[in-house]
Curated annotation (Swiss-Prot):
InterPro entries: Aminoacid_DH-like_N_sf (IPR046346), NAD(P)-bd_dom_sf (IPR036291), THF_DH/CycHdrlase (IPR000672), THF_DH/CycHdrlase_cat_dom (IPR020630), THF_DH/CycHdrlase_CS (IPR020867), THF_DH/CycHdrlase_NAD-bd_dom (IPR020631)
Function: Catalyzes the oxidation of 5,10-methylenetetrahydrofolate to 5,10-methenyltetrahydrofolate and then the hydrolysis of 5,10-methenyltetrahydrofolate to 10-formyltetrahydrofolate.
Organism the protein comes from: Cupriavidus taiwanensis (strain DSM 17343 / BCRC 17206 / CCUG 44338 / CIP 107171 / LMG 19424 / R1) (Ralstonia taiwanensis (strain LMG 19424))
Protein name, UniProt field: Bifunctional protein FolD
A GO MF term: methylenetetrahydrofolate dehydrogenase (NADP+) activity
EC number(s) per entry: 1.5.1.5, 3.5.4.9
Positions that bind NADP(+): G165, A166, S167, S190
Domain of life the protein comes from: Bacteria
A GO cellular-component term linked to this record: cytosol
GO term, biological process aspect, one: methionine biosynthetic process
Subunit structure: Homodimer.
Catalytic activity: (6R)-5,10-methylene-5,6,7,8-tetrahydrofolate + NADP(+) = (6R)-5,10-methenyltetrahydrofolate + NADPH; (6R)-5,10-methenyltetrahydrofolate + H2O = (6R)-10-formyltetrahydrofolate + H(+)
Length: 283
């Protein structure tokens, strides 16, 4: 029997509805949640992501601001703008869309964001606090993946989980959240010799590499949960993930689609992080 789909769109809609109600209550008290988005350059994919984030804010009662800058913006000017946003009481979350132009040090920029407004969860203070299990914010994509596991009431305690991909944005924080959930976690990276040797034993597989069809049916244990974080395009320009969806769906117990899986949840958890920042600021 084909795997059950974990519908990211449906789950995102439910969580956003609850977030909108919380945002409305805050707004009544004079504390409308506010997200500032900063875009440098003309990267087409970044423009789409930014547009979706701003629209999600508007649709759910959040205040949003969008700063667009040309690709030749200086690092000093960008840092000065972040400093202004750090001091703006109307702004509770600051998101700098990555990637940045090569002449700008993205690490320096992310570290300039006040930790209490770091709704992406990338600041070293939040990344470090994630290790102790008490971050102000969890990175949005791993947070969304955990919510998807929660939605199917998956018993993580004692489960074997394999995260394919070791980025600071997804792979590493994903592994930490799974570990905190009680799973036994393995991280595969670009140097891993035989990824399938690890994934075939896994109860949960999270694919987050950015390589089409990396995870195939013969690499998945029957009944496993497969979460596809990848965002690629096939030969026809159609969106696809890191998982061979058609093949793996015949083996797995649960699977997330691309599109309509992790993507909507990432933006949703950005709203939740911004909302929680606003609630903390409101007291």
């Amino acid at each position: 029997m084909p795997a059950q789909l974990i519908d990211g769109n449906a789950l995102a809609k439910q969580i956003r509805s609850e977030a909108a109600q919380r945002a409305a209550r805050l707004t009544e008290r004079g504390h409308q949640p506010g997200l500032a988005v900063v875009l440098v350059g003309e990267d087409p994919a970044s423009q789409v992501y930014v547009r979706n984030k701003v629209k999600a804010c508007e649709d759910n009662g959040f205040h949003s601001s969008l700063d667009r800058y040309p690709a030749d913006l200086s690092e000093a000017d960008l840092l000065a703008r972040i400093d202004e946003l750090n001091r703006d009481p109307r702004i509770h979350g600051i998101l700098v869309q990555l990637p940045l132009p090569k002449h700008i040090d993205s690490h320096k920029v992310l570290e300039a964001i006040a930790p209490e407004k770091d709704v992406d969860g990338f600041h070293v203070a939040n990344a470090g606090a994630l290790m102790t299990g008490a971050p102000l914010f969890r990175p949005c994509t791993p947070y969304g993946c955990m919510k998807m596991l929660e939605s199917i009431q998956y018993p993580l305690r004692g489960a074997r989980a394999v995260v394919v991909g070791a980025s600071n944005i997804v792979g590493k924080p994903m592994a930490m959240l799974l570990l905190q959930g009680g799973a036994t976690v393995t991280i595969c990276n670009s140097k891993t010799r035989d990824i399938g040797a690890h994934t075939r034993d896994a109860d949960v597989v999270v694919a987050a590499v950015g390589k089409r069809n990396l995870i195939t049916a013969d690499m998945v244990k029957p009944g496993a949960v497969v979460i596809d974080v990848g965002m690629n395009r096939d030969d026809h320009g159609k969106l696809c993930g890191d998982v061979d969806f058609a093949g793996v769906r015949e083996v797995a117990g649960y699977i997330t689609p691309v599109p309509g899986g992790v993507g909507p949840m990432t933006i949703t958890m950005l709203l939740i992080n911004t909302l929680e920042a606003a609630e903390r600021a409101a007291g």
